[in-house]
């Protein structure tokens, strides 16, 4: 039988009524399998997938952070946020994924009360850092494309770094209740045996899981996604309008700026798409269980859906470096140079990916055929680049 980290939903009704389905992000329930083949596959395949996720994720995210820290040309506002994403992913890969993989080798929760308090909070913190950073990145792209003249020209790296720290502070604070209410409980079984499990809320009534799942879905998925969608609606509208209304004398200059900004907007949008694709099944599954925990199918099919959703959610922590590698020429060159025996990174001077730090002409895309709004800001050698160095 698969490891019993959580209550078995196939228990009699009397027992089920007093046992609440734990959070899908922490010590998920695995239904009983009907044979040893499924058990063998689960115990071998899933931990192997987790090992691949951890290895690939650590390599990609560590390399990403190293490139941004060691190359001054890569230190831009968006890259600070992208590094923040990588840091959150590293936290998840180093803590939550190994703990989750251990469920396939142990039948009970083996990390004690302290682990039960910390692991759920760490995972929620990591998810918060990811989704809030993606929202901040979308807001940055909105300002760069729709309102470029509203962007700061001095102290921007410090200010952006403070924003990144603020994202971590908010994410930790929002995860505090998870640490407060998570507890190790002994769960009874229909064969008069019992096992310990870590659950994220008190075992009192069925209202707690419903409130918990709805809040998680709203705060860590739906609300940020709506905000990001609004930003990208205005970004798309501005880019489409500017493509038709730019006069001929500004076409060449503004076309390069538009391509640079559109490229970064595309990268951020891919990050958002990966996050939605990887986490949406987990959120939906948790909502379904929270509102129908007495009726959940304990079959092998339901177990497979659970495992797929779980693997997908953790996979999100290793996909961003791949997306960046495919979409960013400069990151790809730096990454390849790091892999090739630590050779010196390529100096980044490509105007299609990096704006000069000595003089940057910031042109508003809000223009029309009759009245072109063209604003220029000259930045000295110590000023910070407003566009991504990708």
UniProtKB/Swiss-Prot annotation:
Q: Which InterPro entries match?
A: Bombsn_rcpt-like, GPCR_Rhodpsn, GPCR_Rhodpsn_7TM, NeuroB_rcpt
**Disulfide linkage:** 116-198
Cytoplasmic membrane side? 66-79, 140-156, 236-266, 328-390
Record's keyword terms, sorted: Cell membrane, Disulfide bond, G-protein coupled receptor, Glycoprotein, Lipoprotein, Membrane, Palmitate, Phosphoprotein, Receptor, Transducer, Transmembrane, Transmembrane helix
- Predominantly, its location class is membrane
Q: A GO molecular-function term, please?
A: neuropeptide receptor activity
Q: Where in the cell is it found?
A: Cell membrane
Query: Which residue stretches are annotated as topological domain Extracellular?
Result: 1-41, 100-117, 178-211, 288-299
As for membrane topology, the entry says: Multi-pass membrane protein
Q: Which domain of life is it from?
A: Eukaryota
List the protein's name.
Neuromedin-B receptor
Please give the organism: Rattus norvegicus (Rat)
């Amino acid at each position: 039988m698969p490891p019993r980290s959580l209550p078995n939903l196939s228990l009699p009704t009397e027992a089920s009524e007093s046992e609440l389905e734990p959070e899908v992000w922490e010590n998920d329930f695995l239904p009983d399998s009907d044979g040893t083949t499924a058990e063998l596959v689960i115990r071998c395949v899933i931990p192997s997938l987790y090992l691949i996720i951890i290895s690939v994720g650590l390599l990609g995210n560590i390399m990403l952070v190293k490139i941004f820290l060691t190359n001054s040309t890569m230190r831009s506002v968006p890259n600070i946020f992208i590094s923040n994403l990588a840091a959150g992913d590293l936290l998840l890969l180093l803590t939550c994924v190994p703990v989750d993989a251990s469920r396939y080798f142990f039948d009970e929760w083996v990390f004690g009360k302290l682990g039960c308090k910390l692991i759920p909070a760490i995972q929620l913190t990591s998810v918060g850092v990811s989704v809030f950073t993606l929202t901040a990145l979308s807001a940055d792209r909105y300002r760069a494309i729709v309102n470029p003249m509203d962007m700061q020209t001095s102290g921007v790296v410090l200010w952006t770094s403070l924003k990144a720290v603020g994202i971590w502070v908010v994410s930790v604070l929002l995860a505090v209740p998870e640490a407060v209410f998570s507890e190790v409980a002994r769960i009874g079984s229909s064969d008069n045996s019992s096992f310990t499990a870590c659950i994220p809320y008190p075992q009192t009534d069925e209202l707690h899981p419903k409130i918990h799942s709805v809040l998680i879905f709203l705060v860590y998925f739906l609300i940020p996604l709506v905000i990001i969608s609004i930003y990208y609606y205005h970004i798309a509208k501005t880019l489409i309008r500017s493509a038709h209304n730019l006069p001929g004398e500004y076409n060449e200059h503004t076309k390069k700026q538009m391509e640079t900004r559109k490229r970064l907007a595309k990268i951020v949008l891919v990050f958002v798409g990966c996050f939605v694709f990887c986490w949406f099944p987990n959120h939906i599954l948790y909502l379904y269980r929270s509102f129908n925990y007495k009726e959940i199918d304990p079959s092998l099919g339901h177990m497979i859906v659970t495992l797929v959703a779980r693997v997908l959610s953790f996979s999100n922590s290793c996909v961003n470096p791949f997306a960046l590698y495919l979409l960013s020429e400069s990151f790809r060159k730096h990454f390849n140079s790091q892999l090739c025996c630590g050779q010196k990174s390529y100096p980044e001077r490509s105007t299609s990916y990096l704006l000069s730090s000595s003089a940057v002409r910031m042109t508003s895309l809000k223009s029309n055929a009759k009245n072109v709004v063209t604003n220029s800001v000259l930045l000295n050698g110590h000023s910070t680049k407003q566009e991504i160095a990708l």
